[in-house]
Amino acid sequence: MAKNDKINFSTPSGFPEFLPSEKRLELYLLDTIRRVYESYGFTPIETPAVERLEVLQAKGNQGDNIIYGIDPILPPNRQAEKDKSGETGSEARALKFDQTVPLAAYIARHLNELTFPFARYQMDVVFRGERAKDGRFRQFRQCDIDVVGREKLSLLYDAQMPAIITEIFEAVHIGDFLIRINNRKVLTGFFQSLDISETQIKSCISIIDNLEKIGEAKVKLELEKEGINPEQTQKIIDFIKIDGSVDDVLDKLKHLSQTLPESEQFNLGVSELETVITGVRNLGVPDKRFCIDLAIARGLNYYTGTVYETTLIGHEALGSICSGGRYEELVGTFIGEKMPGVGISIGLTRLISRLLKAGILNTLPPTPAQVVVVNMQDNLMPTYLKVSQQLRQAGLNVITNFEKRQLGKQFQAADKQGIQFCVIIGADEAAAQKSSLKDLKSGEQVEVALADLPEEVKRRLT
């Protein structure tokens, strides 16, 4: 590099970085989500950021996601050696685009070491070749849970997912939300009753999944492009627009099952949906938190049963803030055994970005510190260090100012970081084993004995 060449140190488009106040908010949300996941017995795992490409692409797992491939970048001398020898390198590898496909590979690798049903959570970054724009990222954190069984998996695990979603979003106080539930078998069975082919059904599900993005008129147009005739198209539109209370929709589906040509798939889907709804209610989730929405399809090919999407009421334009569903064949792809699973995912990076922009969430102070012990005189540093440790041992987060500056500047720096208290100890205070405690929020300053300082700070902390 030439001496005057400048390095472009800006972040690559679509790859976020966080200021301390933003990162602390993310950590708070991660901790809240983790506590709820663990309260239901989910256990943490970690999978590699890089997987073999054939794993990520198996059986159409990739969907519409653009995968980032990984190629080693060799030093110039090594590259020349490789070119000369004609080496082709190792198998193709890529960055994971979600947590679910790597979970399937993980279970295949550790099948005999795990206990089933296997309930895991993972809160990790994934990578997709999204078109970088506001609220969409190429690197983002997902907070996933999945339960995977061997041969069978109770539908009560499907019912448990809305209960978990409800606990998380009520705990973080983001306002009213609605969990929209459907079953892919209901959709598939309805399409079969219209004599739509299996290949067309997959396309129809993907098109319906975009209803809110592209609107009804474009959905009709896209369906007709797939060879769906106008009569079939209108029946599909009428079907996915069925609404009402949960019980109303279930009643309409049961009535429809009596008028449709015999469809085992449709009837099974309605039965599963009713079982899940009953379980959701038994878990104490209030009816205002969920509904049946027949337009919810989830575009990924591996979903086969229950599907979920969660939206914020009044902020529907933000899109889904938590989604997921049941899959029957994803894990079995790797081991040739039936291993049904169900899971949900919270796209946390995207969620934080959208909620901050909408003013629904606020960042936290940039430091976790609650107290600053200011530096009045360098020769009193042994006292400052001792007092700081006493405060920490009482469970407080403390910064000790090692550099002596004007007192006003030390107050300003503490206030800028959102720190509530400053402890002031000069020569006279040190000799008398006292301190001045300044509350930067209220401006109040009181004299406190050093022995009483930890409890006084905790008493006043807001």
From Swiss-Prot:
Transmembrane among keywords: no
SUPFAM superfamilies: Class II aaRS ABD-related (SSF52954), Class II aaRS and biotin synthetases (SSF55681)
Reactions that this protein is recorded to catalyse: tRNA(His) + L-histidine + ATP = L-histidyl-tRNA(His) + AMP + diphosphate + H(+)
Record-level GO cellular component terms: cytoplasm
Molecular-function annotations in GO: ATP binding; histidine-tRNA ligase activity
Subcellular location, principal: cytoplasm
Cytoplasm recorded as keyword: yes
Any single GO BP term: histidyl-tRNA aminoacylation
InterPro entries: aa-tRNA-synth_II, aa-tRNA-synth_II/BPL/LPL, Anticodon-bd, Anticodon-bd_dom_sf, His-tRNA-ligase, HisRS-like_core, HisRS/HisZ, HisRS_anticodon
Pfam families: HGTP_anticodon (PF03129), tRNA-synt_His (PF13393)
Keywords: Aminoacyl-tRNA synthetase, ATP-binding, Cytoplasm, Ligase, Nucleotide-binding, Protein biosynthesis
The enzyme's E.C. designation: 6.1.1.21
Top enzyme category: ligase
Subunit structure: Homodimer.
Family matches, as NCBIfam families: hisS
Protein family membership: Belongs to the class-II aminoacyl-tRNA synthetase family.
Protein name per its UniProtKB record: Histidine--tRNA ligase
Phylogenetic placement of the source organism: Bacteria, Bacillati, Cyanobacteriota, Cyanophyceae, Nostocales
